[in-house]
UniProtKB/Swiss-Prot annotation:
Pfam families: Aminotran_5 (PF00266)
Protein's UniProt keywords contain Cytoplasm: yes
Disulphide bond pairs: none
Source organism (scientific name): Pasteurella multocida (strain Pm70)
Positions of modified residues (N6-(pyridoxal phosphate)lysine): 206
Tagged with keyword Iron-sulfur: yes
Protein name (record): Cysteine desulfurase IscS
Binding-site residues, [2Fe-2S] cluster: 328
Length: 404
């Protein structure tokens, strides 16, 4: 077993060796390096064929038509293109958008930008388990609502939203439905032939593909129109100009192909490992799981260890790579806005650790992690005056702290 142990697969994944090998065939002069938009020679034709094959693999995994896949630089761009593109195209119908407070920043900040442009956004509060109240969503819908954007799986707490039910509500009101599926594609079965989803964002690097490439599913039936953000040569049916990075697209396609083959056996394996981790940690006193355990991705565990400061716990756990909050915002010392939206107080939100498991996680690594966390929590609580007060039965909420 090698240290440090990587348990931050929701932040990114290593590129699968099979994917890297495939990508190498599309880079050098010995390989297939052509521009897929070059229609006048073999180099271009071969590159175009490689892109088509990859596009089919991606469509196959999610039950879509390959013509519905638009390549982007990643899920952040896909979120931007979906939300801004739809808002700008359909603004004559209305300027109201609905999303949730626990969405990824790529969705929330895009909505904030649209607010600056005169759109109105309703931010739904999740329930304490992280799930959305469908009645609340229904009540938030108005005649001028043009778009609902709700993620499939939350990146911090792994909670799975009922996108089938949300899709039905949206379709009944003729409102476009965008799903950020960055954390769910390849980990949960998704069939867009059945789901009433109009737009769906996807990433490659959360699925053992390369960084810097992603895709947006844009429904053809019913047809969804978008206003482009990036203009140029009119690539990707005019929705996203720019020379296609063939090696990255091939990598993403191969990663999605592998996931389709291995998902049925891989997810139960990860669930067993995640449950082993949970069972090893749940008996630590004052430990709380954040988000629904029932409606949750099999590879995610987000736990708060009360009376332990999150950053010091991260330092004590330097032999394992975990995170507090998402990678995109973990550089700030603010407590996770996702956990705050669930109603956690600052202390509990600050003491949360996200463990996310993946393809290379082993049983040995999980057992090592359990022991390490147990010892670290015990050690840090020994140093904590708050823990002593709690053990003495003092209600910390009744104490008035002096502010310096």
């Amino acid at each position: 077993m090698k240290l440090p142990i990587y348990l931050d697969y929701a932040a990114t994944c290593p590129v699968d060796e099979r994917v890297a090998k495939k990508m190498m065939e599309y880079l050098t002069v010995e390989g297939n390096f052509g521009n897929p938009a070059s229609r006048s020679h073999k180099f271009g034709w071969q590159a175009e064929e490689a892109v088509d094959v990859a596009r089919n693999y991606i469509a196959d995994l999610i039950g879509a038509d390959s013509r519905e896949i638009v390549f982007t630089s990643g899920a952040t761009e896909s979120d931007n293109l979906a939300i801004k593109g739809a808002a700008h195209f359909y603004q004559s119908k209305g300027k109201h958008i609905i999303t949730c407070k626990t969405e990824h920043k790529a969705v929330l900040d895009t909505c904030r930008q649209l607010e600056r442009e005169g759109f109105e956004v309703t931010y739904l509060n999740p329930k304490s388990d992280g799930l959305i109240d469908l009645e609340e969503l229904k009540n938030a819908m108005r005649d001028d609502t043009i778009l609902v954007s709700i993620m499939h799986v939350n990146n911090e707490i792994g909670v799975i939203q009922d996108i089938a039910a949300i899709g039905e509500l949206c379709r009944a009101r003729k409102i476009l439905f965008h799903v950020d599926a960055t954390q769910s594609v390849g980990k949960l079965p998704i069939n867009l032939a059945e789901l009433k989803v109009d737009l769906m964002s996807m990433s490659s690097h959360k699925l053992y593909g390369p960084k810097g490439i992603g895709a947006l599913y844009v429904s053809r039936k019913p047809r969804v129109r978008l206003e482009a953000i990036i203009h140029g040569g009119g690539h990707e049916r005019g929705m996203r100009s720019g020379t296609l990075p063939v090696h990255q697209i091939v990598g993403m396609g191969e990663a999605y192909r592998i996931c389709k083959e291995e998902m049925a056996s891989e997810m139960p394996r990860l669930k067993a490992l995640r449950d082993r981790l949970y069972n090893g940690l749940k008996d630590i006193e004052e430990t709380y799981v954040n988000g629904s355990m029932e409606h949750r991705l099999d590879s995610n565990l987000n736990i708060s260890f009360n009376y332990v400061e999150g950053e010091s716990l991260m330092m004590a756990l330097r032999d394992i790579a975990v995170s507090s909050g998402s990678a995109c915002t973990s550089a700030s010392l603010e407590p996770s806005y996702v956990l705050r939206a669930l109603g956690l107080n600052d202390e509990l939100a600050h003491s949360s650790i996200r463990f996310t498991l993946g393809r290379y996680t082993t049983e040995e690594e999980i057992d090592y992690t359990i022991e390490l966390v147990k010892n670290a929590v015990a050690k840090l609580r020994e140093l904590s005056p708050l823990w002593d007060m709690f053990k003495e039965g003092i209600d910390l909420n009744t104490i008035e702290w002096t502010h310096h």
